[in-house]
Amino acid sequence: MATRTVTVGSASGLHARPAALFVAAAGAAPVPVTIRTGQKRAVPANSMLSVLSLGAKQGTEVVLEADGEGAEAALDGLAELLARDLDAEEPADA
């Protein structure tokens, strides 16, 4: 199983727009991905409600896990996304 630990970089944490971008990217991954904070139970990374329920604020460490072909690359991309301040970036459709 592939695992990545990453610190949430967005100023608002995993809330609203950053969470939506992350959930969309996780849903496009070639393997199922889970996300958790601390010792909490892992939740599906492609579920907006589950991701929001984590209450991950800026600076929170989250753990991403996936298994299967393409898991390493998928987690690399998702970890890079979470580490950025998505609040400071312009929306792609702007």
Walk through the language-model features, giving the residues of each.
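Intrinsic-disorder/low-complexity, polar/charged segments enriched in Ser/Thr/Lys/Arg/Asp/Glu/Gln
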Residues: 1-5, 61
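Broad hydrophobic/π-residue packing in well-ordered secondary structure
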Residues: 2, 15, 29, 80-86
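Compact, glycine-rich, soluble single-domain proteins
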Residues: 7-58, 72
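C-terminal structural segments of small proteins and small subunits
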Residues: 57-94
